[in-house]
Design a protein with these regions (language model features):
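Flexible, low-complexity inter-domain linkers and amphipathic docking helices that mediate domain-domain
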Residues: 1-38, 373
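N-terminal beta1-alpha1-beta2 module of alpha/beta enzyme domains
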Residues: 28-105, 110, 207
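An alpha-helical appendage that flanks or caps ligand/catalytic pockets
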Residues: 30-39, 162-198, 240-339, 370-372
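Flexible, glycine-rich active-site loops centered on histidine and acidic residues
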Residues: 38-56, 120-187, 229-231, 236-238
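Active-site mouth loops of central-metabolism enzymes
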Residues: 47-60, 116-124, 205-215, 273, ...
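Conserved, mostly hydrophobic/aromatic
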Residues: 74, 82, 102, 133, ...
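Glycine-rich, proline-tolerant flexible connector loops at the mouths of alpha/beta enzymes
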Residues: 77-98, 117, 235-237, 344-355
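Alpha-helix-loop-beta-strand connector modules within alpha/beta enzyme cores
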Residues: 89-113, 167, 171, 358-373
């Protein structure tokens, strides 16, 4: 154990509280100016829980209830990830399964994958599975595709990890073609070729597609040139970097000659409440969530680093905080160019508390608010 770890472990609760306060004072107060929150900014729910904080059955019941509430409140979409072999996101190894369950419990909300790890699957299976969900939902499916990043995931892959980005591009185009009803040749047994056309036929003629971007500028460029939307997050990129990436995406979209302006979805953590103990209430769940995230990336889980990261979330551009703070962040994201904000709600808080908070999240208005300068 390092000397820093030993010193942190020796802190009593009051000393840890004072440490947190000291870290917080190092963050400059935001300068604010009035701005109107655009009505076009869509809001959705993102699900990306760590599988070490609840039992699976209870978690799935929570997802279905939250999705039903979002549907009733007129929210735009729910998004489900694909993760393998780790706790982080581990409740969703196949987003089509959760999507199918939600499709039968909702009426209007869109149901999206955020994302499908394209290199791990045959394009025909992706098209088939999601066409089922499209039929169950009456045409509410959309897919964001990712290239995968963890080498362990590629135990499931047909192709080499080093070729994952090229494979992703080919897979997306194959899925889109199959979705439209085209027939594609695929290798079969004994050196033969199968002419594949998928069933069932989906409700939507065209599949809405996004490319998942962690913040790497080239991914925004690739998506724009191909005519895809972008699904990104504030985890791993700053607000200035996000603004630059979105501006780059819009310019590349225009230069490629596409109609419209593309589509950008930004995910951020969300729990909106005026409760006076909010910081202390959120801390254990956020520490555990960040620890799970750092575990998969090989990062440190020392208290001071977790606390620093937590306070960055609390005081930065997340929807963790009061309604006034959340409205300000939504305005900032709209000003940065976001078309949709995905609210990640399942980061370890008790399900009852999250569900109780959803009306406040859904009721964030479009009146004049404050925006960080």
């Amino acid at each position: 154990m390092s000397d820093l770890s030993a010193r942190l472990d020796a802190l009593n609760p009051e000393q840890r509280r004072r440490l947190s306060a000291g870290l917080r004072t190092q963050r400059a107060e935001q300068v604010r100016a009035p701005v109107a929150l655009p009505e076009h900014l869509r809001r959705s729910l993102y699900f990306f829980a760590s599988a070490d904080h609840a039992d699976a059955g209870s978690y799935y019941a929570f997802v279905l209830e939250a999705a039903a509430e979002a549907d009733a409140a007129g929210q735009h979409a729910v998004w489900f990830p694909e993760r393998h072999f780790v706790d982080f996101g581990g409740f969703s190894p196949n987003p089509a399964l959760l999507a199918a369950a939600v499709a039968t419990r909702t009426r209007t909300i869109r149901i999206h994958a955020g994302s499908v790890a394209a290199p791990l699957h045959h394009p025909a299976r992706i098209a088939e599975e999601w066409a089922v969900v499209d039929n169950l939902s009456g045409g509410r499916v959309g897919l964001s595709f990712g290239s995968g990043w963890h080498p362990d995931d590629f135990a499931l892959a047909r192709d080499d990890y080093r070729e994952r980005r090229e494979v992703t591009g080919r897979t997306i185009e194959d899925v889109r073609a199959l979705w439209r009803g085209e027939t594609l040749p695929y290798p079969s047994t004994a050196g033969t070729t199968t002419e594949a056309s998928t069933r069932p036929r989906p409700v939507q003629e065209e599949l809405p597609v996004w490319l998942t971007a962690t913040g790497t500028p080239q991914t925004f460029v690739t998506a724009a040139r191909a005519g895809y939307g972008v699904a990104t997050a504030l985890l791993g990129q700053t607000m200035p970097a996000l603004r630059e990436n979105i501006a780059r995406y819009r310019q590349e979209w225009q230069d490629a000659g596409h109609s419209g302006k593309g589509d950008v979805v930004v995910m951020t953590h969300a729990y909106v409440s005026d409760r006076p103990d909010l910081e202390d209430f959120l801390r254990p769940a956020m520490h555990a969530y960040l620890r799970s995230f750092r575990k998969q990336t090989g990062g440190s889980d020392e208290f001071v680093l977790l606390e620093n990261a937590y306070l960055d979330f609390l005081t930065g551009p997340s929807l963790l905080g009061s309604p006034a703070k959340a409205r300000a962040v939504l305005a900032d994201l709209a000003a940065a160019g976001a078309d949709e904000v995905g609210c990640l709600i399942d980061f370890g808080l008790p399900a009852a508390d999250v569900l109780e908070s959803l009306p406040t999240l859904f009721d964030l208005g479009v009146a004049a608010v404050e925006r960080s300068a």
